[in-house]
Structure formats: structure tokens, C-alpha cells
């Protein structure tokens, strides 16, 4: 009965949050908008993002700031769900956190490999990652080369797959991205079997399998177009 009550509480929480998500039809409407101002007005009127957008100064309404606010909203939702979970469900939440970590590492790789003059813009993510992640943003932002970036991940699970790629010849950003994607899906595929029970596992594997298929299509397209 305890597990049933625990899950029912989470389901109630998630359904309440889901009810505030944008629908497919609303995304179609958004795609027809022509400016950031129109987008913000639409989100303020039609979505849960009103909570984080309504107080933004008009001078701050440009793409970079909007993306930051929406990402922080995502992290806020993760935090709300995580706090509501029991220990077993938190193990599942850690699998989701890995996706955020991969995105962070890929962002940093683009900065150092492409030698962007723009510095790392990650301070707004620090509080969230300090609380839930094995990655130290404070260490990552000191990197100026791929060697330094990989070494700054030495205390994490991502060090081994990245070092293996780093030590090969003529490595590209594409190679790093592919290595991280492969590691992410193979590791979470194994871990999910330890965490989830049969019905939950089947649902998660179906979802994860679809994402792997889409990723394969994406990589095939990129390989044909650029190589």
C-alpha cells in the first residue's frame, strides 16, 4: 500500500504539471509567430511560463535571455518532482539528469573546439548542477582546450569515454558528440533495468528506443550531408 500511495502522489503531481504544458496545436501557432515579443506575449497568455516571463524587463527580451529563463523553468520542474520522489524514484530521476549533463558537456565542447571569443555562459545553471549533478561547472568554465575540459571531468563517469576519443587522431566535435550520445544511451539502457519494474521498464524502453531511432536518423543525415 505504501508504494501505491507513493506513486499515486507523484502521478497526481505530474498530471497537474502536464495540464499546463503546451499542446501540439499551440506549438503550431507558435511556429507562425515572427518576433520574440510576440512569442513572449503568447507564452504569457497561454502557458505556465507566465510565472517566469511576466516580470522580465522589456529590454531583456532577446533570445539568449528567454532561453535561460525557460531552461531554469525546466530545472525548477525537475526539482519539484525530485523532492516529491522516494529513494527508488530518485534513482530514475538521476537518469534524466544525465541528459542535462550531456547537454552541458556538449555546450562546453563547442566553446573550446570552435575557439569562441564569447566566454562560458553557465553561471545561471550553477545552483542546479551543484545540487543534483556530479559535474562541477566551476571546473568546466576554466577550460580553454579539449584536453583541459576532459581532465576537468576526471571525477565523473564521462571522463573515460571522452578520454578514449581525445587520445585518437584527428578528433572532431562530431566524434565527441557521438561518443557522449552512445555512452548516454548504453549506460541508461543498462541502469534502467536495475531501477524499473516490468510495466515501467517496458514503457521507458519504448520511449528510449524511439529516441535512439531518431538519433540514428539524425547521425545518418549528418554523415551523408557533411562527410
Language model features by range: what are they?
Residues 1-227:
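N-terminal domain-start signal
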Amino acid at each position: 500500500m505504501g508504494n501505491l500511495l507513493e506513486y499515486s502522489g507523484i502521478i497526481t503531481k505530474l498530471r497537474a504539471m502536464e495540464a499546463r504544458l503546451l499542446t501540439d496545436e499551440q506549438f503550431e501557432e507558435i511556429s507562425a509567430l515572427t518576433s520574440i515579443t510576440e512569442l513572449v506575449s503568447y507564452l504569457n497568455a497561454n502557458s505556465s511560463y507566465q510565472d517566469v516571463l511576466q516580470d522580465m524587463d522589456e529590454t531583456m527580451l532577446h533570445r539568449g535571455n528567454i532561453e535561460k529563463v525557460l531552461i531554469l523553468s525546466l530545472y525548477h520542474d525537475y526539482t519539484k518532482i525530485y523532492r516529491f520522489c522516494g529513494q527508488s524514484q530518485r534513482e530514475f530521476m538521476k537518469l534524466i539528469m544525465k541528459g542535462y549533463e550531456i547537454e552541458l558537456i556538449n555546450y562546453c565542447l563547442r566553446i573550446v573546439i570552435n575557439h569562441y571569443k564569447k566566454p562560458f555562459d553557465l553561471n545561471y545553471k550553477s545552483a542546479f548542477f551543484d545540487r543534483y549533478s556530479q559535474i562541477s561547472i566551476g571546473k568546466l568554465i576554466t577550460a580553454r582546450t579539449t584536453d583541459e575540459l576532459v581532465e576537468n571531468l576526471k571525477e565523473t563517469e564521462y571522463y573515460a569515454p571522452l578520454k578514449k576519443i581525445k587520445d585518437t587522431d584527428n578528433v572532431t566535435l562530431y566524434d565527441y558528440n557521438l561518443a557522449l550520445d552512445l555512452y548516454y544511451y548504453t549506460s541508461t539502457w543498462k541502469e534502467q533495468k536495475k531501477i524499473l519494474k516490468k510495466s515501467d521498464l517496458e514503457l521507458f524502453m519504448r520511449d528510449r528506443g524511439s529516441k535512439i531511432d531518431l538519433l540514428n536518423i539524425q547521425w545518418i543525415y549528418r554523415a551523408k550531408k557533411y562527410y
